[in-house]
């Protein structure tokens, strides 16, 4: 019996270290930021079994066999569709402003199409304005309505959107809605989805979360885009979920969420449409490619139209493109750079680009909420404040709610608006969307909103920051340790 237990112990010991060695090799063979690799290795060695389970659940980007197969099957059709779109040469811009040209060159190289011109873009600065505008456009829809949101929650003005969708479906408009399973889990416990499906709306739960899928697909990979498409002509995107902030997370203690959206008319809606079609087919297996732009209704030739590029991220899209675009925009800045984000946990490359911009004389401002709904992110973000404050970056802490707006404005000319947070999850993992707009008037509108945020904020100075308690510094560093995983 003693021999049996001895052999069993040695076999356990052997397989244990074989498992650790195998997972270590797997971690090292995946290309990722060094800080992320080191963090995973430390977790695996400090908490071996827990670390191994956590790594296979959250450490690798895998969609699941079914979605991978859908993506593989549809890619040739997407490529063919893009080639057809390129034949509409009059919709593509040939010239950009000096500050915008580098980012448009980058995105054209990585995505295969240039920016599109002749768009009409309106900045919607409150959730009330955004929800009312969406409802009006739904009421006027004739052909199709497509939406994707991370969070959908009933209450307030969202009920008007829902009722408008139901009435649109009843009059024959094709309605397809996709919402994230984790972000909208409370909504799926209500009769809301069933009510819309009964009206003829296709309502899909994206990236479903349950115990049986835990090891089949990465659970923290989320559908974080916010897109509305109407009649292949009108589109919306931005930071707002399908929620009325007066009824959303009122017990979180952070105040109402503050968001912006952009309403767009023109060929940019077609480029958003192919992204939605990709997501829909990956989730359902159904193919609904958008039609090419209609020459009779698209405002191609408007001299004052906005030049726009859409950047998408997530599995199946060009890797790291949103981070590359952000860094390119930052290095293009010569006078002014203003950024708003609810979660500031940047990669080292992004943090260094921001600091370098300030050190070379650019007026850099970052606006973040004083309080947000994530304990880890709140403290991890503060670990970056010393570096950027010492470089001369102005840090403003928004006092009037949870500032959820994700925006970038460069030199009063280049703007970026979308769903992307300045954290590792948005930059490296989730399905995200950002629109890049090369237009002085739009940048002026955005800067007015950003400076309104600053007026409702408190500036954090380096002297004040260095006086924070020692335990705060310890907590910041502990949370910073996990920043590559946030």
Swiss-Prot record:
<keyword id="KW-0812">Transmembrane</keyword>
<keyword id="KW-0443">Lipid metabolism</keyword>
<dbReference type="GO" id="GO:0005886">
    <property type="term" value="C:plasma membrane"/>
</dbReference>
<dbReference type="InterPro" id="IPR022924">
    <property type="entry name" value="Cardiolipin_synthase"/>
</dbReference>
<feature type="active site">
    <location>
        <position position="224"/>
    </location>
</feature>
<keyword id="KW-1003">Cell membrane</keyword>
<dbReference type="Pfam" id="PF13396">
    <property type="entry name" value="PLDc_N"/>
</dbReference>
<protein>
    <recommendedName>
        <fullName>Cardiolipin synthase A</fullName>
        <ecNumber>2.7.8.-</ecNumber>
    </recommendedName>
</protein>
<feature type="domain" description="PLD phosphodiesterase 2">
    <location>
        <begin position="399"/>
        <end position="426"/>
    </location>
</feature>
<comment type="similarity">
    <text>Belongs to the phospholipase D family. Cardiolipin synthase subfamily. ClsA sub-subfamily.</text>
</comment>
<keyword id="KW-1133">Transmembrane helix</keyword>
<dbReference type="InterPro" id="IPR001736">
    <property type="entry name" value="PLipase_D/transphosphatidylase"/>
</dbReference>
<feature type="domain" description="PLD phosphodiesterase 1">
    <location>
        <begin position="219"/>
        <end position="246"/>
    </location>
</feature>
<feature type="active site">
    <location>
        <position position="406"/>
    </location>
</feature>
<comment type="function">
    <text>Catalyzes the reversible phosphatidyl group transfer from one phosphatidylglycerol molecule to another to form cardiolipin (CL) (diphosphatidylglycerol) and glycerol.</text>
</comment>
<dbReference type="GO" id="GO:0032049">
    <property type="term" value="P:cardiolipin biosynthetic process"/>
</dbReference>
<dbReference type="InterPro" id="IPR025202">
    <property type="entry name" value="PLD-like_dom"/>
</dbReference>
<keyword id="KW-0472">Membrane</keyword>
<feature type="transmembrane region" description="Helical">
    <location>
        <begin position="3"/>
        <end position="23"/>
    </location>
</feature>
<feature type="active site">
    <location>
        <position position="231"/>
    </location>
</feature>
<dbReference type="InterPro" id="IPR030840">
    <property type="entry name" value="CL_synthase_A"/>
</dbReference>
<dbReference type="InterPro" id="IPR027379">
    <property type="entry name" value="CLS_N"/>
</dbReference>
<feature type="active site">
    <location>
        <position position="404"/>
    </location>
</feature>
<keyword id="KW-0594">Phospholipid biosynthesis</keyword>
<keyword id="KW-0997">Cell inner membrane</keyword>
<feature type="active site">
    <location>
        <position position="411"/>
    </location>
</feature>
<feature type="active site">
    <location>
        <position position="226"/>
    </location>
</feature>
<feature type="transmembrane region" description="Helical">
    <location>
        <begin position="38"/>
        <end position="58"/>
    </location>
</feature>
<dbReference type="Pfam" id="PF13091">
    <property type="entry name" value="PLDc_2"/>
</dbReference>
<keyword id="KW-1208">Phospholipid metabolism</keyword>
<dbReference type="GO" id="GO:0008808">
    <property type="term" value="F:cardiolipin synthase activity"/>
</dbReference>
<keyword id="KW-0444">Lipid biosynthesis</keyword>
<keyword id="KW-0677">Repeat</keyword>
<keyword id="KW-0808">Transferase</keyword>
């Amino acid at each position: 019996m003693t021999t049996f237990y001895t052999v069993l112990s040695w076999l356990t010991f052997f397989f244990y270290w074989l498992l650790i060695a195998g997972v270590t090799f797997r971690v090292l063979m995946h290309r990722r930021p060094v800080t992320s690799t080191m963090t995973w290795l430390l977790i695996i060695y400090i908490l071996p079994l827990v670390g191994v389970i956590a790594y296979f659940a959250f450490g690798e980007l895998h969609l699941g066999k079914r979605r991978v197969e859908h993506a593989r099957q549809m890619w040739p059709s997407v490529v063919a569709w893009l080639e057809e779109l390129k034949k509409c040469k009059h919709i593509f811009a040939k010239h950009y402003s000096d500050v915008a040209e580098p980012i448009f060159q980058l995105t054209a190289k990585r995505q295969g199409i240039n920016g599109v011109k002749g768009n009409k873009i309106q900045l919607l600065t409150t959730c009330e304005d955004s929800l009312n505008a969406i409802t009006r456009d739904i009421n006027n829809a004739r052909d199709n309505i497509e939406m994707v949101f991370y969070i959908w929650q009933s209450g307030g003005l969202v009920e008007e959107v829902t009722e408008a969708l139901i009435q649109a479906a009843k009059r024959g408009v094709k309605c397809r809605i996709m919402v994230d399973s984790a972000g909208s889990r409370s909504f799926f416990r209500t009769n809301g989805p069933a009510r819309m499906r009964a009206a003829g709306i296709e309502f899909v739960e994206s990236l479903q979360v349950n115990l049986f899928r835990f090891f089949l697909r990465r659970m923290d990979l989320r559908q974080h885009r916010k897109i509305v498409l109407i009649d292949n002509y009108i589109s919306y995107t931005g930071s707002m979920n399908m929620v009325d902030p007066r009824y959303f997370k009122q017990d979180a203690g952070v105040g109402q969420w503050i968001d912006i959206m952009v309403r767009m008319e023109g060929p940019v809606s077609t480029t958003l449409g192919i992204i939605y079609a990709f997501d829909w087919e990956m989730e359902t297996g159904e193919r609904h490619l958008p039609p090419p732009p209609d020459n009779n209704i698209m405002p191609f030739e408007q001299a004052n139209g906005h030049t726009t590029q859409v950047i998408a991220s997530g599995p199946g899209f060009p890797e790291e493109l949103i981070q590359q675009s952000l860094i390119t925009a930052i290095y293009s800045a010569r006078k002014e750079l203003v950024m708003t984000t609810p979660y500031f946990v940047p990669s080292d490359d992004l943090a260094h680009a921001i600091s370098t911009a300030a050190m070379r004389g650019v007026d850099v401002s970052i606006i973040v909420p004083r309080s947000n709904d994530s304990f880890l992110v709140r403290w991890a973000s503060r670990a970056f404040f010393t570096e950027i404050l010492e470089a001369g970056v102005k840090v403003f802490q928004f006092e009037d709610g949870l500032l959820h707006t994700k925006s970038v404005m460069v030199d009063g000319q280049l703007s970026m608006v979308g769903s992307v947070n300045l954290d590792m999850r948005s930059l490296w993992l989730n399905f995200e969307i950002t629109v890049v707009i090369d237009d002085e008037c739009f940048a002026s509108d955005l800067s007015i909103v950003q400076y309104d945020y600053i007026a409702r904020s408190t500036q954090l100075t380096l002297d004040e920051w260095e006086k924070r308690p020692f335990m705060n510094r310890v907590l910041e560093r502990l949370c910073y340790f996990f920043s590559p995983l946030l």
